[in-house]
């Protein structure tokens, strides 16, 4: 049986705003949610001889045996340890992540993407007044949100933010309110090996197109399924185009269908293939 081990998520207070937000979300996504959906063990006190063990971003490899799996995520500190333990198997979370790890490690590497949050396959219908939205919890996110909201107001487009979300349901409730999503990266490093497209696949699973600055490799598996922007002017231009119902429907259908590849039922099949 699959047995997943992960450190629990926790809340951290944003000193700039006083709000709390969830850290270590990967434990909930690739630990709790996958375990509950598949009926696997989760943080079991004892391991059986025939358990297939997956450790999500562990601090060390001390308790990990050859043949176990390590889900690296953004744990760059694990790479030197894994080089010393080629018998430990590795899980990558995106295509660019997989390619990087393949180049760095001699270990067996398996690609398993994040599943999206829309287990129920809920489909959005467009608001009468177009509304966009973004998520985040950094001080920069608040500043960006205000800039985008002010830029869209003159063209009659509403803009909402979700900064204090803590549960999957919080995110579902948010996505049910918006027609398009903005992933604004600004000066953020878009070349990192640990980048992945989940941030734009989540809204896509509701039929919500994303406007975003392209990642170098990080969006590789979702290329062609988001609307590229470069600056605030292009963001406004592309958002205005989405007012057209026919144009919007083309994008909504396109991204909704592609996001099905990342439904939890599809991702669970990849876990079942591990040996």
Regions found by a protein language model. Give the residues of each.
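A charged, aromatic-enriched C-terminal amphipathic alpha-helix characteristic of glycosyltransferases
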Residues: 29, 119, 230-234, 243-275
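Donor nucleotide-sugar binding/catalytic pocket of nucleotide-sugar-dependent glycosyltransferases
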Residues: 89-100, 106-121
